[in-house]
């Protein structure tokens, strides 16, 4: 796959993605699987991952990093983990901000129903699209 550290011309990017239908003005266009995967990975790479947390909940990744098979938790998450559906926890998760941005959680937190806001975010908040900062 192409080196994505460069900003390609749109013509070159269309070739890399095997983008079909765009130039004809179609509403529905097609890209090859590798091209779509590349776009997804570039998107995912923009978000900081809590590497310690990711390694703790994915012992296979931790083992692979320790053996040198994978360089980092972020590399794994971007290249495979996200596409496999592995859980995401941001490196910059802020419990105070999470509670302020999601006031509906306050009562459940005070009642002890949500003892750990980070766990709540990972298990349901992320899928619900809740903001954390």
Predicted regions and their residues:
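Charge-rich, low-complexity intrinsically disordered regions
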Residues: 2-133
């Amino acid at each position: 796959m192409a080196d994505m550290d460069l900003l390609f011309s749109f013509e070159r990017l269309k070739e890399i993605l095997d983008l079909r239908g765009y130039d004809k003005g179609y509403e529905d266009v097609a890209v090859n699987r590798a091209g779509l995967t590349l776009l997804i990975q570039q998107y995912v790479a923009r978000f900081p991952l809590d590497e310690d947390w990711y390694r703790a909940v994915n012992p296979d990744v931790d083992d692979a990093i320790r053996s040198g098979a994978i360089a980092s938790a972020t590399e794994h998450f971007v290249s495979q983990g996200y596409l496999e559906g592995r859980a995401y926890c941001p490196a910059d998760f802020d419990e105070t901000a999470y509670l302020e941005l999601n006031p509906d959680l306050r009562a459940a937190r005070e009642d002890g129903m949500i003892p750990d806001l980070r766990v709540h975010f990972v298990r349901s908040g992320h899928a619900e699209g809740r903001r954390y900062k």
